[in-house]
C-alpha cells in the first residue's frame, strides 16, 4: 500500500512539474505579444558612421541612454554626440509635451517635436526587434539559438543566409532603400524571465557597409526596465532654451 501511495505521489509531482514548465513555443509567443505591447523602458541607442578612408577622427554619431515612453513619445536622454574632427560633446535631450529640448556645448535649444512620433531617438522606430516582420520570426523556434542563465532565457536570431537576407529586407524597408552590401552583420536578441514569465530585455546591433561608399554604419540598442512608470522632468535651465527656426520646405 505504501509503495502504491508513493508511486501516486511521484506521478502527481511529475505531472505538476510538467505543467509548470513553459514550452519554448509558449515563451516565444509571450515575447512576441509583450514586445508589441511595450509602452516604455530604459533605452540605450548608438548610431555611428565610420569613414574607413580616414585614419583618425573618422567617426560621427551619438551614444545616448535614459528613460523613454512611446505613446505619445517622450524621453529624457543623456550621452555624447561625436563629430569627426570636432571630437565629442555631451548630449542632453528631452521630448515633453510636444516640444524637443537639447543641450549642446552648455547651450539650450528647443523646437516643436514630431507629430508622428518619428524621431532619431525613438527606440520603437529604430529597433529592429519591434518591427512586425522581425516579430513574425518568433513564430518558428528553429529561427533562434536559445541559451539559459538562471531564470533568464535568451533568444538570439540565428546567423544563416536565409535569415540574413530577411534581416536585410527588414532593415532596407525602414531605410526605404535597397543598397548592395559589402558587409552586413546583425544581432537580434530577446531576453525572457521564466520566473515572472515576463519579457526582460531587447537588444539589437546592425553593422553595414556598401561597396559604393567608404562608410560603415553601426546601429545598436538596448531596452530594459520594461514598462516602467516614467515621468519626464525638464531641468530648470531648459526654461532659457532658445527657439530653433524650422527649416523651410
Listing of model-derived features with the role each one plays in the protein:
Residues 15-18:
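C-terminal motif of bacterial Sec signal peptides marking the signal peptidase cleavage site
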